[in-house]
């Protein structure tokens, strides 16, 4: 497969953009080689600058649940842009959007729009601290909540791929306010709360981890965490940046029957445009300025073009049978990938919840940061490039989730599994 134009663009990019990319995991450091540069996407397919086409299992890292260039979203974007790309003032669509989010997400009574997932999580932590008067937060090893300073402690995802346990530039005094516990270990949370509970403002967690690869919560784990938070007066912040409107229409909180105090959202709610949000209990959200004293603002918050895209996306997802169809296709991929790996005698573990999945190159169960780290990243890199050569675009890191879109049908599933058959067999021969 020819990638000459991609290679030339990457050489140019490295002269002006740090590492040649605008987000670290895109640089292919986790798999080796040079990144592919793309020129367009349509439905389930991406086309690169050299004209190669790929079934896309990245989906812009989660937002594109309806696939690329979904016509109703494009129409909404064009119509909104014709009326003005930004107002810097209130408008009717943002009210409708807020009402739709609150009507759909079980624990969200009020919501504030922002422009990214990181902005949402940083603001949620500030609100939790302001509401409780406490300074410490608890996060979970391998969970990634964006690039905000409080979260770059055992953060997984691109940080792990780069081999950086934390990021330089995060003050040690600030890092000390972030406590960590292993994912799926309630006993560890109990110990931390027993020792520090009176100082902890909130526990923030990805209900299904997507940034250490997909980690599935053990039965009762999330419910137990919620109960411990309530016992100790610690706010539960559910980071649904990935899972919101993806695992079910009401996100992971609907799927697992949770009632978090605060929820963060992004990705799917923007329909492919820059969008984030945080919301939750009315008494907490009324502390946000200008209703209350906790300050947060943004020039492009509630941007009319992004809101129009988000509205079109969420309305499309409300169609009957949408999530059942997404589950069916995702399950076909999971079962097929496991079967092809087994046929090639390549030990893997496939973790999946809904339309999020990861193929871990280990035969052992993967349920937390430590077990995920045991995966064979070199072997994953070989698998990634073998799949790329067979026109399948996977996340370029062992520690990222693949995302299935509604644009993927049986022909695309067959294409992916045929590619996987060749890729697994090549690994079986060469290691």
From Swiss-Prot:
**Encoding gene, per UniProt annotation:** hemL
Q: Which cofactor does it need?
A: pyridoxal 5'-phosphate
Instruction: Specify the protein name.
Output: Glutamate-1-semialdehyde 2,1-aminomutase
Parts forming coiled coils: none
- Catalytic function, reaction form: (S)-4-amino-5-oxopentanoate = 5-aminolevulinate
Q: Which family does it belong to?
A: Belongs to the class-III pyridoxal-phosphate-dependent aminotransferase family. HemL subfamily.
Enumerate the CDD domains for this protein: OAT_like
One GO CC annotation: cytoplasm
The biological processes this protein is annotated with in GO are:
protoporphyrinogen IX biosynthetic process
Q: Where is the PTM N6-(pyridoxal phosphate)lysine found along the chain?
A: 267
Could you give a GO molecular-function term held by this entry?
A: transaminase activity
Instruction: List localization entries.
Output: Cytoplasm
Enzyme Commission number(s): 5.4.3.8
Question: Which species expresses this protein natively?
Answer: Myxococcus xanthus (strain DK1622)
Q: In which pathway does it act?
A: Porphyrin-containing compound metabolism; protoporphyrin-IX biosynthesis; 5-aminolevulinate from L-glutamyl-tRNA(Glu): step 2/2
What is its quaternary makeup?
A: Homodimer.
PROSITE patterns for this protein? AA_TRANSFER_CLASS_3
**Keywords on record:** Cytoplasm, Isomerase, Porphyrin biosynthesis, Pyridoxal phosphate
Q: Which Pfam families does this chain map to?
A: Aminotran_3 (PF00202)
